[in-house]
């Protein structure tokens, strides 16, 4: 059966069971701001399950377009290198909204798989939640699946109800157990049954998940039975197609065979020569054309933010892989026609948008091909020196100047065994963003043409102005005489208590009221040095130039902000005391949540130094010293010893704030006395650039809540360790000693196990012209065990070429050894690389001993089987 026939069979089967066939929702969720992209069949029915929406049917079936390439669900890095990862996939599903439940859901699934898809019953395994006896009984007694092929899965993710077989929509809300159906590919494929230590192999593949929503979880963690339980199922079309077409990779199904052929032709038409049809890069391109095309169909275009940036990342990743294969002109857009041929019938919107999709992708390619060659040259230069990590500045330059998303750079580096300095990249990105934010504020303010009188600021003394007259209104940057309910506007008042953002302190929020008119002010900024814009939404009534309002600052948020601002001054002084007079402020952000303070210092601030700073600041708070502000001439301020920011421009008169032992020039709002701060706590310390450190701190009730949370965590740890809080460090130290002892014991046991295996493996040697050849897997071995066992086997076999392998966590470890008398003909380094290349890796070493790694355990058996032939060609 073709993929299109499988999709049709699924939908028609459930239609025959009374289900409404519902079209796929867009990959861009229209009514769920919590989702970047649609990533499951149930997304469009979320409000139905939650009881917020009703449909004219209680049974539904869909084939849903899904994307997993951003946010929590992100498969992008794995695509092209595994058999089943995709950025775009189709999720087949059937749903019951308070209609049928477990019996019918399980029976329908079994009937479709065994009677319509003709899957052998003895090839199907199922899992159930360990406490779901009802599902177990249905599978065993009603359907007839033998007990040995039904696996109970418990809470295997570290907490109650945290299980592969228990589904939750969130921390609260509908949830319930699920049952999963697996297909056994047979003994020739490595891997164990679900629930076993080897379950991550490719032998047993999950093809269908049935979720039974029968509980509502409340905030206290209690499970309450739902009055009308529901069913949500999902089966990946690509996976079931691979099973029905008797192939082990999704990229071998008919749909992808066609797309891979089109991708190969497109790349070769753009300069690629004799492209390997098995190349992972072709798989990347074939996968990404689906994600890009359907995202564009649903209204997204490549950009630098949100979904547009995810689309750009996917498209440019595909283009880079084409470039790797030799393409030097646009090629990616040429594959759209084949995609439409394959999927246009099922998704008419794709066929209708073919020309637009092609043009959007072509334009994106043309844009990237202008810079990709130069960018790759820069990246190649960075990689040429044998570095193990590309620095963040280079990665950011590639991103900012040459359009390389950082994960594209990381993709190239990963192929060379090199990493990217993500922290350095993030710091460079944040620096640019902060500059952009500042520029944005300036542009917004500069774009508002204002020539009236300055704003009189009363916010140092008052939080309310009873009569504030509107002197200007701006909507979308345009001056207007009036604004209506629903408008977002910037309003200039003649008098205001609102502090406008400056000096690192966030602008005030609050409200303007006048009879039936109410404006919620979200932010206050400076249009000019002495003209304040109040940015907010008119929620009731209307506003006209000349109207008078009561202007009221949000007192709670102002109080939190001034606590943080005053604490920043005390912290600055304390840092100079503890670290030295070289400490100078380099930037700050003060709002109601916290203070963030950047300063010059060339080393991390130690925990002990942070404790000193906290002690100094909290001592100032306990002293409850009054704060005072004076306006004076700049010369007088300098003579008074007030601290000034180097490079800052000041007017002839300045405002000097004295608080505790601190004296600084500052135009911000502050507490009346240090005691008003309440409590001061540093919560983070980090480096943001060379010679620049950053401290984040909180005050008042935020600091108290933070400490209470820490106390709760420590008490929880103590409870888990069954010890008193003061004894926790010693208890943890004791457990660490135990772990080290157990690890040592485990290593010894592994050595004994390997030794015993080594004796039994001698019988598997093959004699080739007098050279004994052995290529086997050592169960439970690690790299050290492979080396030890290799030495033992070489001593016993005398004249031999040996390859030992171990699989752990989806990775392959290899060791090759050749006895000294045979290295002239067979070299261990060449031998281990021959095997490693077959399992997606590489390695090296000496002629008599070499190590390697690989990423594809599924090909290990074949790789080991090829060793005797390779050796035979050399002896």
UniProtKB/Swiss-Prot annotation:
Cofactor(s) of this protein: Zn(2+)
Key words, A-Z: Aminoacyl-tRNA synthetase, ATP-binding, Cytoplasm, Ligase, Metal-binding, Nucleotide-binding, Protein biosynthesis, RNA-binding, tRNA-binding, Zinc
Pfam families in the cross-refs: DHHA1, tRNA-synt_2c, tRNA_SAD
Superkingdom per UniProt: Bacteria
The protein's enzyme class: ligase
InterPro entries in the cross-refs: aa-tRNA-synth_II/BPL/LPL, Ala-tRNA-lgiase_IIc, Ala-tRNA-ligase_IIc_anticod-bd, Ala-tRNA-synth_IIc_core, Ala-tRNA-synth_IIc_N, Ala-tRNA_ligase, Ala_tRNA_ligase_euk/bac, DHHA1_dom
Record EC number: 6.1.1.7
Location(s) in or outside the cell: Cytoplasm
Recorded catalytic activity of this chain's protein: tRNA(Ala) + L-alanine + ATP = L-alanyl-tRNA(Ala) + AMP + diphosphate
Keyword Ligase appears in the UniProt entry: yes
GO cellular component, one term: cytosol
Keyword Iron-sulfur recorded: no
Record GO terms (molecular function): alanine-tRNA ligase activity; aminoacyl-tRNA deacylase activity; ATP binding; tRNA binding; zinc ion binding
Sites where the protein binds Zn(2+): 565, 569, 666, 670
Cofactor comment text: Binds 1 zinc ion per subunit.
Any single biological process term in GO: negative regulation of DNA-templated transcription
Physiological role: Catalyzes the attachment of alanine to tRNA(Ala) in a two-step reaction: alanine is first activated by ATP to form Ala-AMP and then transferred to the acceptor end of tRNA(Ala). Also edits incorrectly charged Ser-tRNA(Ala) and Gly-tRNA(Ala) via its editing domain.
Entry's family note: Belongs to the class-II aminoacyl-tRNA synthetase family.
NCBIfam families the UniProt entry points to: alaS
Domain commentary: Consists of three domains; the N-terminal catalytic domain, the editing domain and the C-terminal C-Ala domain. The editing domain removes incorrectly charged amino acids, while the C-Ala domain, along with tRNA(Ala), serves as a bridge to cooperatively bring together the editing and aminoacylation centers thus stimulating deacylation of misacylated tRNAs.
Name of the protein in question: Alanine--tRNA ligase
Organism: Leptothrix cholodnii (strain ATCC 51168 / LMG 8142 / SP-6) (Leptothrix discophora (strain SP-6))
């Amino acid at each position: 059966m073709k993929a299109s026939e499988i999709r049709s069979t699924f939908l028609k089967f459930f239609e025959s069971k009374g289900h409404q066939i519902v079209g796929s929702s867009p990959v861009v969720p229209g009514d769920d701001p919590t989702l970047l992209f649609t990533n499951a069949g149930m997304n469009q029915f979320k409000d139905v399950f939650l009881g917020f929406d009703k449909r004219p049917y209680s049974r539904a079936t869909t084939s849903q377009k899904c994307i997993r390439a951003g946010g929590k669900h992100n498969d992008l890095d794995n695509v092209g290198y595994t058999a089943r990862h995709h950025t775009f996939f189709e999720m087949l599903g059937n749903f019951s909204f308070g209609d049928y439940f477990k019996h019918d859901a399980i029976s329908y699934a079994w009937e479709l798989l065994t009677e319509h898809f003709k899957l052998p019953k003895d090839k199907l395994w199922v899992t159930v939640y360990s406490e779901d006896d009802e599902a177990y009984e249905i599978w065993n007694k009603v359907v007839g699946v033998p007990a040995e092929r039904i696996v109970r899965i418990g809470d295997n993710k570290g907490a109650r109800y945290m299980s592969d077989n228990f589904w939750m929509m969130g921390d609260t809300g509908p949830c319930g157990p699920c049952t999963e159906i697996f297909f056994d590919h047979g003994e020739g494929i490595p891997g164990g049954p679900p629930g076993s230590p080897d379950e991550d192999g490719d032998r047993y593949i999950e093809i269908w998940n049935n979720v039974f929503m029968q509980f509502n979880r409340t905030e206290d963690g209690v499970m309450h039975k739902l009055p009308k339980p529901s069913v949500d199922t999902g089966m990946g079309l690509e996976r079931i197609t691979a099973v029905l077409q008797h192939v082990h990779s999704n990229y071998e199904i008919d749909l992808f065979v066609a797309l891979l052929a089109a991708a190969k032709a497109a790349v070769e038409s753009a300069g690629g020569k004799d492209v390997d049809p098995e190349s992972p890069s072709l798989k990347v391109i074939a996968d990404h054309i689906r994600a890009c095309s359907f995202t564009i169909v649903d209204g997204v275009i490549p950009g630098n933010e949100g979904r547009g940036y995810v689309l750009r990342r996917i498209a440019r990743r595909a283009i880079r892989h084409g470039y790797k294969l030799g393409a030097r002109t646009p090629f990616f857009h040429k594959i759209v026609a084949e995609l439409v041929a394959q999927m246009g019938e099922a998704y008419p919107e794709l066929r209708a948008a073919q020309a637009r999709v092609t043009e959007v992708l072509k334009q994106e390619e043309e844009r990237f091909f202008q810079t990709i060659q130069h960018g790759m040259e820069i990246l190649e230069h960075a990689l040429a020196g044998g570095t193990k990590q590309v620095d963040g500045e280079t990665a950011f330059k590639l991103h900012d100047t040459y359009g390389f998303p950082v994960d594209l750079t990381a993709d190239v580096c990963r192929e060379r065994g090199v990493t990217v300095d993500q922290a350095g990249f993030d710091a460079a990105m944040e620096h640019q963003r902060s500059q952009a934010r500042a520029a944005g504020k300036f542009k917004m303010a500069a774009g508002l043409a204002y020539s009236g009188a300055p704003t009189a600021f009363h916010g140092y003394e008052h939080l309310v102005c009873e009569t504030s007259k509107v002197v200007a209104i701006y909507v979308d940057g345009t001056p207007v005489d009036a604004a209506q309910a629903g408008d977002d506007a910037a309003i200039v008042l003649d008098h205001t208590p609102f502090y406008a953002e400056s000096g690192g302190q966030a602008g005030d929020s609050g409200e303007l009221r006048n009879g039936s008119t109410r404006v919620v002010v979200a932010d206050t900024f400076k249009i000019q040095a002495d003209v304040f814009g109040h940015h907010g939404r008119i929620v009731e009534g209307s506003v006209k130039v000349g109207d008078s309002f009561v202007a009221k600052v949000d007192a709670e948020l102002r109080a939190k902000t001034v606590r943080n601002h005053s604490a920043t001054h005390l912290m600055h002084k304390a840092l100079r005391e503890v670290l030295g007079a070289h400490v100078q402020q380099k930037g700050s952000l003060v709002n109601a949540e916290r203070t963030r303070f950047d300063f010059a210092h060339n080393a991390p601030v130690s925990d002990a130094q942070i404790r000193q700073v906290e002690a100094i600041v909290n001592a100032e708070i306990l002293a409850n010293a009054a704060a005072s502000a004076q306006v004076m001439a700049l010369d007088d301020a300098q003579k008074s010893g007030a601290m000034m920011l180097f490079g800052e421009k000041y007017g002839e008169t300045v405002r000097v704030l004295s608080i505790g032992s601190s004296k600084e020039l500052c135009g911000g709002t502050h507490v009346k006395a240090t005691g008003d701060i309440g409590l001061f706590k540093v919560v983070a310390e980090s480096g943001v650039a060379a010679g620049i450190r950053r401290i984040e701190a909180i005050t008042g009730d935020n600091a108290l809540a933070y400490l209470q949370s820490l106390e709760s965590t420590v008490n929880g740890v103590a409870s888990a360790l069954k010890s008193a809080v003061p004894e926790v460090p010693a208890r943890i130290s004791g457990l660490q000693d135990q772990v080290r002892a157990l690890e040592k014991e485990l290593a010894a046991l592994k050595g004994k196990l390997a030794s015993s295996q080594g004796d039994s493996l001698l019988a598997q040697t093959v004699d080739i012209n007098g050279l004994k050849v052995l290529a086997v897997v050592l169960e439970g071995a690690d790299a050290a065990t492979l080396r030890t066992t290799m030495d033992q086997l070489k001593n016993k076999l005398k004249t031999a070429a040996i390859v030992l392998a171990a699989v752990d966590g989806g990775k392959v470890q290899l060791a090759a050894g050749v006895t000294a008398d045979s290295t002239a003909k067979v070299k261990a380094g060449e031998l281990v690389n021959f095997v490693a290349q077959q399992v997606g890796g590489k390695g090296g070493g000496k002629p008599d001993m070499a190590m390697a790694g690989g990423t594809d355990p599924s090909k290990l058996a074949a790789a080991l089987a090829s060793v005797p032939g390779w050796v035979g060609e050399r002896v």
